[in-house]
Amino acid sequence: MAATARHYDTILSPVITEKATLLSEQNKVVFRVSADASKDEIAAAVEELFKVKVTKVNTLVTKGKTKRFRGIIGRRSDVKKAIVTLAEGQSIDITTGL
């Protein structure tokens, strides 16, 4: 199956934080994903784009913070993240582009 535009729209960007780096030692990779993406869609997109085998996908939604700038109250957008567990022996180098 070839990568489609939906696969590229599903995976927005890798999350590069201290916690995500620690998870990479457990064969897990963290991505920002589209808010309407399901776990099955995320797994299919990662498998197709990176040519790896996905064993599990966990998702979470981080609620946007309320911020104030010069007395005007605004709100940051909610962000959906996916923690993707790869099969044993598989890895993704997230420093290379898609």
UniProtKB/Swiss-Prot annotation:
GO MF annotations in UniProt: rRNA binding; structural constituent of ribosome
Gene for this chain: rplW
KW Ribonucleoprotein (keyword) present: yes
NCBIfam families recorded: PRK05738.1-3, PRK05738.1-5, PRK05738.2-4
Protein's name in the database: Large ribosomal subunit protein uL23
Family of this protein: Belongs to the universal ribosomal protein uL23 family.
This protein's UniProt keywords: Ribonucleoprotein, Ribosomal protein, RNA-binding, rRNA-binding
Function: One of the early assembly proteins it binds 23S rRNA. One of the proteins that surrounds the polypeptide exit tunnel on the outside of the ribosome. Forms the main docking site for trigger factor binding to the ribosome.
